[in-house]
Amino acid sequence: NNQQSLEGRFHKLIEAIKFVYSSLFFRDSRDYFRIIGKDVRNERMAIIIQEVVGNRYGDNFYPLISGVGRSYNHYPTQKAKREDGVVNLALGLGKTIVDGGWSWIYCPAYPKSPPPYKSIREILNSSQTSYWTVKMGHIPEFNPISEIEFMEKSPLEKAEKDGTLR
């Protein structure tokens, strides 16, 4: 986060942890558990805290690339098997991937395989058009239920101006 003091950063970290745990009881979460036939009270969770590595560009901070790897690929293409896994890569924070946004996808067992698209037009229509950053400027007013209080979604043109798409 962009708090000036270590104490302020610590308090924002504690708020974020509380938000993650309480999110289990949000309506969307309860609806999801009802749909899959599980009792939300039996759910277990853990929190991993990791440093975001990147650079500051004006009032925004973001990594050039973030990724999510999964050991199981529900939609393998060409020679890939489900057990080969899948990787998604995106510019900026991993929220793009986690939220199901457009990202580059490939199978680690076959990294040179062509993408599973039939045309250049299909590739362009399935490409990332925005990215998430950490806002480093003005500290926003506290919002206990906002997951994006310190984040900003920007169009790729902004990253191009930052010089990160070369």
Regions found by a protein language model. Give the residues of each.
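Conserved mixed alpha/beta core segments that line enzyme active sites in large multi-domain catalysts
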Residues: 1-166
